[in-house]
C-alpha cells in the first residue's frame, strides 16, 4: 500500500484535523519558542518591567518547546565568563 492510496482512503475531514494538529503542534513546540529565545536574547538588558513579566509568562506557557531547544541554544551575555 503506497502513500497515495493510504491518503485517499482516509476521509478528508480526518486529514484536515491531523493537519491542524500538526500545524498547531509545530507552532507551539518550534516556532514560538524559537522566536521567544531570540526575542529574549536581543532585548534582555533593555526590557522594562511589563515586558519582562510578559516574557516570563510566555516562557511558562511555551515551556515544553523551550525545553526542546534549551540544550542546543546558549545565549550567554557578552563579557561574562572566561574568554
Swiss-Prot record:
GO terms for molecular function: oxidoreductase activity, acting on NAD(P)H, quinone or similar compound as acceptor; quinone binding. GO terms for cellular component: plasma membrane-derived thylakoid membrane. Keywords: Membrane, NAD, NADP, Plastoquinone, Quinone, Thylakoid, Translocase, Transmembrane, Transmembrane helix, Transport. The chain crosses the membrane at residues 18-38, 53-73. Its EC number is 7.1.1.-. The keyword Iron-sulfur does not apply. NDH-1 can be composed of about 15 different subunits; different subcomplexes with different compositions have been identified which probably have different functions. The gene is ndhL. Belongs to the complex I NdhL subunit family. It is an enzyme of class 7 (translocase). InterPro entries: NADH-quinone_OxRdatse_su_L. It is a multi-pass membrane protein. NDH-1 shuttles electrons from an unknown electron donor, via FMN and iron-sulfur (Fe-S) centers, to quinones in the respiratory and/or the photosynthetic chain. The immediate electron acceptor for the enzyme in this species is believed to be plastoquinone. Couples the redox reaction to proton translocation, and thus conserves the redox energy in a proton gradient. Cyanobacterial NDH-1 also plays a role in inorganic carbon-concentration. Its main location: membrane. It catalyses: a plastoquinone + NADH + (n+1) H(+)(in) = a plastoquinol + NAD(+) + n H(+)(out); a plastoquinone + NADPH + (n+1) H(+)(in) = a plastoquinol + NADP(+) + n H(+)(out). It is found in: Cellular thylakoid membrane. This is NAD(P)H-quinone oxidoreductase subunit L. The keyword Transport applies.
Amino acid at each position: 500500500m503506497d502513500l497515495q492510496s493510504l491518503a485517499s482512503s482516509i476521509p478528508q475531514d480526518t486529514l484536515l484535523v491531523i493537519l491542524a494538529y500538526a500545524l498547531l503542534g509545530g507552532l507551539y513546540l518550534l516556532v514560538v519558542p524559537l522566536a521567544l529565545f531570540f526575542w529574549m536574547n536581543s532585548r534582555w538588558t533593555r526590557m522594562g518591567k511589563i515586558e519582562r513579566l510578559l516574557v516570563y509568562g510566555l516562557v511558562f506557557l511555551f515551556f515544553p518547546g523551550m525545553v526542546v531547544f534549551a540544550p542546543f541554544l546558549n545565549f550567554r551575555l557578552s563579557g561574562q565568563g572566561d574568554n
